[in-house]
Amino acid sequence: MEQVTVDGGTGVIDTTSVPTQPELPQSLRIALATGQMRRPLGDTLRPLLDLFADGEYQVTGPERLAEDRYLTPSADWPPADVSRVGYYRTAIKSGHRPVAVVLETTGAAVILDGHHKIAAYREEAILPHLLIISPLG
């Protein structure tokens, strides 16, 4: 678990409502797709964190989704790109653990990135691996 500070954030991602799915830089998309997350997570996730409003946040993971946890999609569900889901299914079957990013607030746990990954995990009957970002305070 890490505590990170956003200073000079754009506020594009609103933690008080269901945000839209953000566009991430390729380097971060690759890290999430492969599950190879470098620490500190605050540095690795900085391009995403800079979309949040200024404040303190907690970043945890990667960790498996709890069986009783419900996730709210920020994009179409189920994902329309079946080939992308298939790509992640193949990766998961071969032992890779791609990581989805979730914004957890008091009202919901919203998928910011990883809709295809989560769909693939579900089709493989494996609990998804998540990075969880939560506002503090």
Show where each model-derived region lies:
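N-terminal extension/subdomain marker
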Residues: 1-37
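Short alpha-helix boundary/capping and kink motifs at helix termini
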Residues: 24, 31, 40-43, 47-110, ...
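A sequence-level detector for short glycine-anchored, His/Arg-bearing signature motifs
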Residues: 108-123
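Ligand-binding loop in jelly-roll beta-barrel domains
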Residues: 125-127
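Generic beta-sheet signal
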Residues: 131-133
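Amphipathic, charge-rich alpha-helical segments that serve as recognition/docking helices
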Residues: 135-137
